[in-house]
Amino acid sequence: MKGLTGPLLITLVAACAPLPPVTPAHTPRSGPFVYLVSHGWHVGIAVEQGEVSPTIWPESAEFSGFRYLEVGWGDADYYPTAHGSVGLALKATFRSRGSVLHVAAFDAGPPEFFGMSKIIEVALSRRGLEDLARFIHATYVLDASGRPVAVAPGIYGRGAFYRATGEYRLLNNSNTWTARALAVAGCPIDAAGAITAGGVMYEARRFGRVIRDGAPWRDVPADGTEREACR
């Protein structure tokens, strides 16, 4: 599993902690939805292409024939490596040479495409989804012609790694990027505190619906109260 000792300890502590209290929610929404996909060491965000205008996220047009796009951000050396070493992990944390954005395109629904992953469905407002798309667009580094710069093949689906903005480090990693994206979209998440995949998923149960879980989570609070909502 990819990861670092410090974040792993935090994940273990969070797993043993009681679940966060769930406050009464606003009126449930019918979408648009995004999906948080836990890959064990980091969390990606899957978006349905038909819900996002390419004028807001123009780079998505490259994969216009696919129903979903999943995105994630990370270190330029560590993230594209199928089996990252401890040495690469330490280098990413303390001597990162840059960052990349991974984009994967696919047609099956996220629960089917990522058949073994923990998944949380999050309902956004239309404005929230547009703000999320702007956040993703702003993460690309563009060339002189205004096009994204592909630097490596993607890990799954059809896609690629693209040169990205931002400096990767221990407290500014793939999971804090995902948490910031959710915060920009209007979700009540502590972006600075969610530095592990477990931390992001733990926070997201406050406002999302668990599609596929893992101990110790439950989808519906025992006391019948509802979730918070993204604005």
Where are these regions (language model features)?
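C-terminal motif of bacterial Sec signal peptides marking the signal peptidase cleavage site
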Residues: 14-15
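A short, compositionally biased
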Residues: 39-41
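Non-catalytic ligand/cofactor/substrate-binding and regulatory segments of enzyme domains
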Residues: 22-33, 37, 48-163
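Activation targets extended, charge/polar-rich intrinsically disordered C-terminal tails
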Residues: 18, 138-231
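Short beta-strand scaffold segments in enzyme catalytic cores
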Residues: 44-46
